[in-house]
């Protein structure tokens, strides 16, 4: 499902939703445990899982960016700084698993925004596939499809 993108005050809110047939604690582990995190976003690792702690982003050029965790409610909310923006994962229990909501608060829409949103879109799909025991193939091909859709939505 494509993200819902709206302007709210002085920011843009990109909201992704996934209904997962897995318990919250399992989904939470995919967001916060480095061995699982590496399977869907290998450039990220949790350095210190607490409010004020950090997520480390490997820029793939020998440099690293420290992303400060601004809200942590174990098992339900993880929010951290993403450059000038914010990313937030929320988990809600459902009878057959959980509802994952991912929100990116964007201060502006740039030429890079569709790349970012396509990346998050694919990452969320990959989490779901991995939890369901599916093989992840052609990840970059999927990204290209979503990149085109987000480009059309935001920049045309």
Question: Model segments located where?
Answer:
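Hydrophobic ligand-binding cavity/cleft-lining segments
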Residues: 1-44
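Short, ordered beta-strand-loop transition motifs
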Residues: 5-11, 49-51, 71-73, 92-96
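Intrinsic-disorder/low-complexity, polar/charged segments enriched in Ser/Thr/Lys/Arg/Asp/Glu/Gln
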Residues: 13-15, 54, 64, 99-101
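Hydrophobic/aromatic beta-strand elements that line small-molecule binding cavities or substrate pockets
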Residues: 17-18, 67-71, 86-93
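Hydrophobic pocket/interface hotspot
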Residues: 27, 37, 55, 69, ...
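Glycine-rich portal/gate segments that line the openings of hydrophobic small-molecule binding cavities
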Residues: 38-84
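Beta-strand/loop substructures that line and gate deep hydrophobic ligand-binding cavities in soluble
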Residues: 79-131
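Short, highly charged C-terminal tails/helix-capping segments
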Residues: 131-156
């Amino acid at each position: 499902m494509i993200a819902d993108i709206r302007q709210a005050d002085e920011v843009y809110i990109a909201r992704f939703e996934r209904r997962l047939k897995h318990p919250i604690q399992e989904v939470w582990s995919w967001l916060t445990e480095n061995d699982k995190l590496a399977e869907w976003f290998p450039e990220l690792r949790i350095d210190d899982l607490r409010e004020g702690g950090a997520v480390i982003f490997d820029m793939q050029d020998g440099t690293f960016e420290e992303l400060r965790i601004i809200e942590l409610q174990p098992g339900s909310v993880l929010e951290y700084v993403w450059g000038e923006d914010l990313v937030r994962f929320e988990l809600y229990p459902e009878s057959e698993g959980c509802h994952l909501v991912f929100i990116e608060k964007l201060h502006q829409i740039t030429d890079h925004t569709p790349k970012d949103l396509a990346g998050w879109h694919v990452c969320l799909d990959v989490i779901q596939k991995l939890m369901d025991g599916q093989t992840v193939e052609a990840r970059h091909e999927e990204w290209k499809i979503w990149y085109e859709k987000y480009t059309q939505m935001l920049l045309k």
